[in-house]
């Protein structure tokens, strides 16, 4: 019998490792409460007042039972009196207390609903704002579905904690204190019996919540893994079907789902035991108090009357209920702390370091041929450096890119680029060729500082790019990435993403330059056609054309074209190339392409192999050398010529 092939796991559900736990739960709890308190201090004070009023109303109602029996019912029965005026007045006062309690409960619920949603809004705002500052490496090493789970599942656990658990815990704590004081006043001896049972309930709660807590952390982790896998499979569904890997995908999902079931089952098994266990212990406490209290009342011991016993037993039940609620709410708090740990882990990720001081500004040329800053768009840009004395130096942006002895690795211990030296002068077209994994795309990612180098230097118009603010550096570059991404919005809005201040006419001109205008006119609503789901209603070639138009509308001095025409048919490529030639005129352009047409007319071709530049020169020079480029050209490139 043939051995079953091993399933290679490609999703985010790798090794699960040891069971995680909440680190510094007290610190996480205080961070959550700071989010609530900093914005809603007055509202939370109002909630506390409402809870106190509600508890006092409940306690007053229970104490009324003792007066009702001892002061009204028993005397009325003994005297055979028909005067119920005193009883009616007492009932009216108690009813007023209950009405106040109802109003307080209603007000508390309304206020907490507003506080909860406002706090979560602020939390999501801070999460998203911080996420925009994170380096690309963070998104490289974390599954996107797992990040989405932080925004949805983990923040939802905080919603339950803020809206329900925190008010209920405070309510129950106030209730326990108030009830205990009242019980001691009624019968210290019975209170001692009750406290012994309360101790047993607390021990049970500690055991159950301790076990459920560690599994809740695992549950949130496994839930993130499941979401990450689903998101990955949705994006790669065509690849799954092409290679007929549906069964393997189902098997991987089942493994992740089984892990989630295991952690969630154990977490909720312990959590759900808390309520029934404490309820039965509470019933036992009630029975013991009733038996002992009945004997004391019948014997007239300790001044315990029938009315006091009735009130005490009601308090006993009232005490058991908040303790059970505390047990149940602790589970929600522990789950929220597990979610909060993941939320704050994202918020504590170190933002992208940007120590640049040089800014990109609109400039104009003066009569003496010097340049200065202007608020108007002049199609002339300059790098602005502010000196210590407050004066500013301006250097015209030309698009001069120089690499000097650059080493780079995605991980410090694994260098993928070695001693890279290159330069691109204004108006030059530099092409990178080489086999897959040679480092072509990596070089372009270093120009826009998606990643920082380990050794060497990169200069832009003579300025070390680490001295230039990243936002200004990237604003000076027009980039068509290998992975085209379109946003939900109209065609025109997607083109305008290259420069948000661009007019409709400028966007249409950019589309025409990229030769995208022809297919846009054929769309149902032309430029106003809505694109959704990363432009799935367009072909891959059409999506690439829009990406090129988006780069064109930015009108940058430097272009980076990473596989820019790899998804366009030969006929469309010729049209695009005509537009791109006009766009590239006078600009430094770096091209990574597999098609001969985008490489052959380059001013300089760099051949990379295993992270090193092994050949450089024009097409004719490299062909004459009959080296690596000659092999590529006569092989792969010749097939596409």
Give the role of each language-model region.
Residues 30, 104, 108, 116, ...:
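Hydrophobic alpha-helical transmembrane segments of ABC transporter permease domains
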Residues 17-25, 57-73, 97-144, 148-152, ...:
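Juxtamembrane helix-loop junctions of ABC transporter transmembrane domains
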Residues 43-56, 164-218, 291-304, 321:
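Transmembrane helices of ABC transporter permease
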Residues 75, 182-196, 266, 270-342, ...:
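Helix-loop-helix
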Residues 127, 131, 240, 343, ...:
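Helix-loop junctions and hydrophobic alpha-helical segments within the transmembrane domains
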Residues 80, 363-641:
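ABC-type nucleotide-binding domain
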Residues 1-58, 73-92, 108-112, 116, ...:
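Membrane-integrated ABC transporters
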Residues 136-137, 153-162, 166, 170, ...:
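An intracellular "coupling" helix at the cytosolic face of ABC transporter transmembrane type-1 domains
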